[in-house]
């Protein structure tokens, strides 16, 4: 497998133990997501990747948590999704399109 090229990175704020997985808008420049899983043993991180993979129609293997494995503020890298595509898909999801 060839090395992954420079990824697009995004800063997120995660709210674990929510009722359901959903985008919750922006807070202080960070995209905020609610995740239903508990923040224990990596469950919320796995569910975050699963949710974003479905939402953004991107393979799970192409999304990686770079920083913040044990905190609410995270940096994610997307290896096959451009910043423009990410922003368009997030905007559409936030506005119900």
Swiss-Prot record:
GO CC annotation: cytoplasm
SMART domains: DUF167
SUPFAM superfamilies given in the database record: YggU-like
Taxonomy, superkingdom: Bacteria
Pfam families per the UniProt record, alphabetical: DUF167
InterPro entries attached to this UniProt entry: DUF167 (IPR003746), YggU-like_sf (IPR036591)
PANTHER family: UPF0235 PROTEIN C15ORF40
Family in the record: Belongs to the UPF0235 family.
Protein name: UPF0235 protein DehaBAV1_1103
Organism from which the protein derives: Dehalococcoides mccartyi (strain ATCC BAA-2100 / JCM 16839 / KCTC 5957 / BAV1)
Taxonomic placement: Bacteria, Bacillati, Chloroflexota, Dehalococcoidia, Dehalococcoidales
């Amino acid at each position: 497998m060839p090395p992954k090229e420079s990824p697009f990175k995004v800063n997120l704020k995660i709210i674990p133990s929510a009722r359901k997985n959903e985008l919750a808008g922006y807070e202080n420049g960070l995209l905020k997501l609610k995740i239903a899983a508990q923040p224990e043993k990596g469950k919320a991180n796995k569910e975050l990747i699963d949710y974003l993979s479905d939402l953004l129609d991107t393979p799970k293997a192409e999304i990686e948590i770079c920083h913040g494995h044990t905190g609410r503020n995270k940096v994610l890298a997307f290896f096959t999704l451009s910043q423009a595509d990410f922003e368009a898909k997030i905007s559409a999801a936030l506005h119900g399109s």
